[in-house]
Amino acid sequence: MGTPQKDVIIKSDAPDTLLLEKHADYIASYGSKKDDYEYCMSEYLRMSGIYWGLTVMDLMGQLHRMNREEILAFIKSCQHECGGISASIGHDPHLLYTLSAVQILTLYDSINVIDVNKVVEYVKGLQKEDGSFAGDIWGEIDTRFSFCAVATLALLGKLDAINVEKAIEFVLSCMNFDGGFGCRPGSESHAGQIYCCTGFLAITSQLHQVNSDLLGWWLCERQLPSGGLNGRPEKLPDVCYSWWVLASLKIIGRLHWIDREKLRNFILACQDEETGGFADRPGDMVDPFHTLFGIAGLSLLGEEQIKPVNPVFCMPEEVLQRVNVQPELVS
């Protein structure tokens, strides 16, 4: 007897319309509750949290409601002497939070708030001989960090600062027989890693190295009867994979292979009608992370109330056009 498929049941009274105003209110109020338990406990990822909040507000046309000057001052205070940027004041710098900070500054057209040359040197210093990147000085290797490195440098116009050819070699060595990618060579394919690797290959103009049909099949297999997407086989659906899977399909030109209407219904069902925001699954607690990726997923599905989102950088297309960064996509 086969393993029962893991999925959720969407109730008949689940939300089926986009509650855009409530989502904007939810994000706008989130950062003002600095004494809340949830806010205090998320300090270790604060920089990414700000990126999630600002990006979703920009996609909804509500960026003006956020405190620009406070955010810029915070980012400036998080850059270390080594050039790297930390999640919060007093924390260690990391490539992930460095990318989040650069994305925020690009949104605000304020990249001069930080020392760009030091950021470039920091990223360059994390590349290893095999082309891979560590996330920080402690040395964890992961294809996520390869993406963070090239995305950061591309936004800064400094991609030539690293050994791009070796970086490409490492990412391609993480490609699996099923067309997907893992965090290191031989690791299991996972939608989050696939997003990072296809995004990396888009930035470095190497998408011709991907078997788009094989990978597209694997990604479409992530859709469950509920319409939601999971990150790998035998897992429950999660709104965040409405981004990781869908953006990957967009990058490789296979977005039309998914059942768009069923996915849209799943995403909408994950809204909280009272507080605003999106949860991972219908009925769960909402948070800014899932709110961004729910809204960004709906943008990829063509939701007209939301600005077009770039599938590689998860930023509004208009922002990438302003800074003249246009990664290659498969048509």
Swiss-Prot record:
It catalyses: geranylgeranyl diphosphate + L-cysteinyl-[protein] = S-geranylgeranyl-L-cysteinyl-[protein] + diphosphate. Keywords: Acetylation, Metal-binding, Phosphoprotein, Prenyltransferase, Repeat, Transferase, Zinc. It is an enzyme of class 2 (transferase). PFTB repeats lie at residues 20-61, 68-109, 116-157, 164-205, 212-253, 260-302. Its cofactor is Zn(2+). Zn(2+) binds at D238, C240, H290. Geranylgeranyl diphosphate binds at H190, A191, G192, Y241, S242, W243, W244. InterPro entries: PGGT1B-like (IPR045089), Prenyltrans (IPR001330), Ptb1 (IPR026873), Terpenoid_cyclase/PrenylTrfase (IPR008930). Signal peptide: none annotated. GO terms for biological process: endoplasmic reticulum to Golgi vesicle-mediated transport; protein geranylgeranylation; protein modification process; visual perception. It holds the Pfam family Prenyltrans. The modification Phosphothreonine is found at T3. GO terms for cellular component: cytosol; plasma membrane; Rab-protein geranylgeranyltransferase complex. One of its GO terms (molecular function) is small GTPase binding. Binds 1 zinc ion per subunit. The keyword Iron-sulfur does not apply. CDD domains: GGTase-II (cd02894). The modification N-acetylglycine is found at G2. Its EC number is 2.5.1.60. The enzymatic reaction requires the aid of a Rab escort protein (also called component A). Belongs to the protein prenyltransferase subunit beta family. Heterotrimer composed of RABGGTA, RABGGTB and CHM; within this trimer, RABGGTA and RABGGTB form the catalytic component B, while CHM (component A) mediates peptide substrate binding. The Rab GGTase dimer (RGGT) interacts with CHM (component A) prior to Rab protein binding; the association is stabilized by geranylgeranyl pyrophosphate (GGpp). The CHM:RGGT:Rab complex is destabilized by GGpp. Interaction of RABGGTB with prenylated PTP4A2 precludes its association with RABGGTA and inhibits enzyme activity. Interacts with CHODL. Catalyzes the transfer of a geranylgeranyl moiety from geranylgeranyl diphosphate to both cysteines of Rab proteins with the C-terminal sequence -XXCC, -XCXC and -CCXX, such as RAB1A, RAB3A, RAB5A and RAB7A. This is Geranylgeranyl transferase type-2 subunit beta. It comes from Homo sapiens.
